Each structure stands twice: as structure tokens, then as C-alpha cells.
């Protein structure tokens, strides 16, 4: 694994959200079966982690969830990602909150890319880690770091948390649902995780 960075604040919110989604008992069982530290079931534990340790824990917890739930993991992780968006908004610094307020006043068509850029700012461990691009009428979010996929090897894309975040952020901004597909994933050997958002008709 490389020395990727991830916010321990987001990691703490992620584990809080997982505990709510699964229930505290099932979360503890999953962590125990995966042979992860049992203290990881207590979100405050992550306050002591540095950004590199947080990135590794984020990947390990999601890997444990995929192993524990098998094919059902996708739905669980998408729901966790969707719930996580509101936590990111609540925890945002003043600049992020101001940007969110501005987005809600923009014309609908202008909100989508601005929202994805706000999400990119929230989840990036460093500047340039997450970028947003226009693809004709559609949009592309590229997570160059993608700590959840770092060191993982899978036949299909695995970044369901990010997918859930994208869907929920766009719904928050526009009141509409969008098709979001992870078209490339680091876990498959790609250099970055790419998410295509179909906005054109």
C-alpha cells in the first residue's frame, strides 16, 4: 500500500454510520471475524490516528464489509455512503458551508458540477486527489487516491461508499436521482477510480 492520506474525522463519521446501519452488535461481530482491532467499533478511537493510518483503516473496514456481506455488501455500502453525505455537510468548515449555500441558489443545471467539486474537496486527502470533469453532457469524478481501493484486488469496482456519496450529494443539490457508474477502479489495476454521472438526456 502507498502512503495515501484520509481524514480521521471522515473515518470516524464512516464508522458511526456503519454502526447505525448494521447495529452495534453486528458491527462488532464483523470486526471480530475480520480480525481487526475491536476498539475500531468505537468511533472515538480514530481521533488518535494520523492521516495515513486512517486511509489504511478505511480500506480495511470496507474490505471486511465486502467479505462479511458478500453480494449484499454493495447495497449496505451504498446506503452508508448516502448517509455519510449529510455528516460531511454538518462537519464542513465555514468555507464549505458557504459553498453549499451558494450551490443551492444556483440554477439546477449549474448545481451538479459545483456539488461534485464540493464533494471532491470534502473527501480529498490532498489537493488534486479528487477531480471533476465534463464529458459532453455527462460528468466524471476521478478519485486519483481512492484509499478504499488502495492495495485491494478485485475483478469488479468496489468503491460503493463514493458512489453513494455522489448519488446523495446530487440528490441534495437538485432533488433528482442520477445514474452513477464506477467505470474504472484501482482495485482492478487502474490508476484511478472513475465515476461517470449520466446527466444528459
Please report, for each region that a protein language model flagged, where it lies by residue.
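Residues forming anionic-ligand binding surfaces in small-molecule and nucleic-acid pockets
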Residues: 143-145
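Short Pro/Gly-enriched beta-strand edge/turn motifs at strand-loop
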Residues: 112-114, 176-179
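Active-site helix/loop of acyl-thioester processing domains in fatty-acid/polyketide metabolism
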Residues: 160-176
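C-terminal, beta-strand-rich globular interaction domains
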Residues: 171, 177-201
Amino acid at each position: 500500500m502507498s502512503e495515501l492520506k484520509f481524514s480521521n474525522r471522515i473515518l470516524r463519521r464512516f464508522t458511526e454510520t456503519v454502526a447505525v446501519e448494521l447495529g452495534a452488535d453486528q458491527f462488532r461481530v464483523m470486526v471480530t471475524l475480520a480480525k481487526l482491532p475491536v476498539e475500531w467499533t468505537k468511533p472515538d478511537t480514530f481521533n488518535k490516528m494520523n492521516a495515513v493510518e486512517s486511509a489504511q483503516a478505511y480500506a480495511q473496514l470496507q474490505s471486511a464489509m465486502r467479505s462479511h456481506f458478500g453480494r449484499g455488501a454493495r447495497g449496505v455500502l451504498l446506503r452508508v455512503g448516502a448517509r455519510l453525505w449529510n455528516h460531511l455537510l454538518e462537519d464542513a468548515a465555514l468555507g464549505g458551508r458557504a459553498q453549499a449555500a451558494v450551490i443551492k441558489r444556483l440554477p439546477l443545471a449549474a448545481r451538479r458540477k459545483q456539488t461534485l467539486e464540493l464533494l471532491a474537496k470534502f473527501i480529498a486527502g490532498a489537493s488534486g486527489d479528487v477531480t471533476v470533469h465534463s464529458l459532453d453532457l455527462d460528468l466524471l469524478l476521478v478519485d486519483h487516491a481512492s484509499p478504499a481501493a488502495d492495495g485491494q484486488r478485485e475483478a469488479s469496482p468496489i468503491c460503493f461508499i463514493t458512489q453513494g456519496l455522489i448519488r446523495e450529494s446530487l440528490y441534495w443539490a437538485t432533488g433528482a436521482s442520477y445514474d452513477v457508474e464506477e467505470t474504472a477502479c484501482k482495485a482492478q489495476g487502474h490508476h484511478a477510480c472513475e465515476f461517470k454521472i449520466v446527466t444528459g438526456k
